[in-house]
A protein has these predicted regions:
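Conserved CoA-thioester-binding segment of acyl-CoA-metabolizing enzymes
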Residues: 73-136, 148, 157, 164, ...
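Short glycine-/acidic-enriched loop or helix-start segments at secondary-structure transitions
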Residues: 12, 140-141
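Short, flexible, mixed-charge acidic loops at enzyme active sites
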Residues: 141-148
Length: 184
């Protein structure tokens, strides 16, 4: 059903997950759960569900969306986008879009933010960068859960790498040749 919502253009995969986590208070959204279980296994479950959705004329009343079929066929996890970029009239708005975690910075967000900043800095038609955060917070800071998980798993090198990469991204924002504004 989550895949059908995305397939019908109701909202994005990230929005479906966010809605489940915020609205239903799930620990993980449906697409995150599919990644955890495995997209292939999730697809097999969806096929079983589809077989239960038979009308009187033996035709299915629900079908698995093509993009879910292709994802399962490739046997790859879903990729989530937590940084959105829009460019209008030379102004690039980069929105950190992880409001369910107060836009806290984790590895994925920092990497995606770095890619977005690099792209708009290289874009000659952009003269201004506006940084924004979706939801109630601009950015809550680093995701503390990341640090706790890495300390518990004795992965201190991951913390050092994350911190180093975070500094590089923040320095690229600070040293941008573009006018840079943060909306808080």
């Amino acid at each position: 059903v989550a895949a059908q919502i995305v397939d019908e253009g109701v909202c994005s995969m990230e929005d479906v997950d966010r809605g489940a986590k915020v609205g239903l208070r799930w620990a993980r959204g449906p697409f995150e759960l599919m990644n955890k279980v495995g997209v292939q296994e999730s697809f097999e479950m969806a096929k079983e569900y589809q077989s239960l959705c038979q009308n009187v004329d033996e035709k299915s009343s629900w079908s698995i969306p093509d993009f879910f079929f292709k994802q399962a066929e490739n046997d790859t996890s879903w990729d989530f986008s937590y940084v959105d970029t829009q460019i209008n009239d030379g102004i690039a708005t980069i929105t950190i879009n992880r409001p369910e975690a107060m836009n806290a910075l984790n590895e994925t967000v920092v990497n995606q933010l770095g890619i977005a900043v690099k792209a708009v800095n290289a874009n000659e038609s952009v003269h201004t960068i506006v940084l924004d955060g979706a939801g109630k917070a601009f950015v809550a800071g680093a995701d503390v859960k990341f640090f706790v998980d890495k300390i518990r798993s004795d992965s201190i090198d991951d913390i050092v790498e994350f911190t180093s990469n975070g500094h590089k991204v923040l320095n690229s924002i600070e040293n941008s040749p573009k006018i840079t504004i943060a909306l808080t």
